[in-house]
Amino acid sequence: MKVEIDSFSGAKIYPGRGTLFVRGDSKIFRFQNSKSASLFKQRKNPRRIAWTVLFRKHHKKGITEEVAKKRSRKTVKAQRPITGASLDLIKERRSLKPEVRKANREEKLKANKEKKKAEKAARKAEKAKSAGTQSSKFSKQQAKGAFQKVAATSR
């Protein structure tokens, strides 16, 4: 014997009882009596109607067995060496004081700035040297030669 469950109230529907409602998207709703069918059609929320199973579950009514909470295993992060950095180096870097870390960072930034400045100066000097050897500047159009106008042909 197949016992169905009311889509609205959650009550049991025994064979030969209840009605079916098939929505346009072919979803089937079963109702135990006209009361739950009517409330469903009025678009009432079963969690707000005191006698439904959903309300009772939602508001923790009735006898409920104490379900032992499932203990989730906490993941522990394991530190592993990365390519180019050994485990000791990583631990050493992590244990550095913020002031020391800040000083190191500023030192590196200063060094990078100096390096960029030197590169820029070298590039500028090279550009000045190459500009001195060049005689006069030509545009691409001048280099190609003057545009030749095609003579118009007539019939």
From Swiss-Prot:
Pfam families per UniProt: Ribosomal_L24e
Top-level taxonomic group: Eukaryota
* Composition bias type Basic and acidic residues, residue spans: 89-129
Where composition is biased (Polar residues), the residues are 131-142
Q: Name one GO molecular function term.
A: mRNA binding
Keywords in UniProt for this one?
Cytoplasm, Phosphoprotein, Ribonucleoprotein, Ribosomal protein
Parts forming coiled coils: none
Provide the positions where the record notes the PTM Phosphoserine: 7
Which biological processes are named by the entry's GO terms? cytoplasmic translation; translational elongation; translational initiation
In which compartments does the protein localize?
Answer: Cytoplasm
Please give the residue ranges the record annotates as the region Disordered. 66-155
Provide one Gene Ontology cellular component: cytosolic large ribosomal subunit
Mind telling me which PANTHER family this protein's record contains? 60S RIBOSOMAL PROTEIN L24, RIBOSOMAL PROTEIN L24
The UniProt family comment states: Belongs to the eukaryotic ribosomal protein eL24 family.
Q: What does this protein do?
A: Component of the ribosome, a large ribonucleoprotein complex responsible for the synthesis of proteins in the cell. The small ribosomal subunit (SSU) binds messenger RNAs (mRNAs) and translates the encoded message by selecting cognate aminoacyl-transfer RNA (tRNA) molecules. The large subunit (LSU) contains the ribosomal catalytic site termed the peptidyl transferase center (PTC), which catalyzes the formation of peptide bonds, thereby polymerizing the amino acids delivered by tRNAs into a polypeptide chain.
Q: What else is known?
A: Present with 247000 molecules/cell in log phase SD medium. There are 2 genes for eL24 in yeast.
Subunit and partners: Component of the large ribosomal subunit (LSU). Mature yeast ribosomes consist of a small (40S) and a large (60S) subunit. The 40S small subunit contains 1 molecule of ribosomal RNA (18S rRNA) and 33 different proteins (encoded by 57 genes). The large 60S subunit contains 3 rRNA molecules (25S, 5.8S and 5S rRNA) and 46 different proteins (encoded by 81 genes).
Protein's name according to its UniProt entry: Large ribosomal subunit protein eL24A
State the taxonomy lineage: Eukaryota, Fungi, Dikarya, Ascomycota, Saccharomycotina
What gene codes for this chain?
RPL24A
